[in-house]
Amino acid sequence: MQLFPAIDLRGGQVVRLTQGDYDRMTVYGQDPCAQARSFVAAGAKNLHVVDLDGAKDGTLSNYDTIAALAKQGGLYIEVGGGIRTEERIEKYLSLGVGRCILGSVAVTDFAFTARMLQKYGDKIAVGVDAKDGYVAIHGWKEVSAEPGVAFCKRLAEAGCTAIIYTDIACDGTMQGTNLSLYRQLAAQVPGVAFTASGGISSEAELLELQQMGTAAAILGKSLYTGALDLARCVQLVQD
């Protein structure tokens, strides 16, 4: 199982939100590149980057920071937040970003998403955020009428091979992740590599996710608060 330590960017700073709430934001650092280097030093090979400003208002205000992160070397980087056009996808891929994550646009413009999946293949992942089992969009402010699992099946039929699935109730809470949900996704949507995201806060959870065949896990607040040690986690999933 791959591990993706997370860097969420707001105004060029490293931050974490609780349950996607911009009013419940904690700043953890002023230097995202230094943070990335510390992840590499702990053995990380991947990095999950979210442009929170882009997600909120579609701006590119963190573009230079993401460009600098992409130049770090030794890291496979996935980027999400405000990616709603092919031009933006091209812009990030040209930096050397490994894959772009489509979020709300996958719900609001499924035809566009299907086209991008066909054109760019594994350079595109889809981020599915679910609230009480239903897909949420636009910074989790709106909840659609479509169940998350059904939406994942539709994405798979459109050629999607990688889905980052977040249970909003768990995200940033440090209360543990929704293990039964990932078990259900693995059983009902075969052929898709799922990344677990939201609330992972123990080594036991990582091992359970790995045993059920989860492709990757995103670690955020658990690393910043010291609840999990990244070097130990990397060893754990490699052994």
Where do the language-model regions lie?
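Catalytic cores of alpha/beta
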Residues: G73, I77-R99, S180-A216
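Glycine-rich, proline-tolerant flexible connector loops at the mouths of alpha/beta enzymes
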Residues: N46-D64, S104, Y165-Q175
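Glycine/small-residue-rich loop that forms an oxyanion/phosphate-binding "nest" at active or ligand-binding sites
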Residues: D53, G58-Q118
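Conserved, mostly hydrophobic/aromatic
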Residues: D8, F39, L47, Y92, ...
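Conserved beta-strand positions in the central sheet of alpha/beta enzyme cores
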Residues: H48-D51, E78, I101-L102, A125, ...
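Charged helix-capping and loop-helix junction motifs
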Residues: L60-A67, K141-A150, Q175-Q184
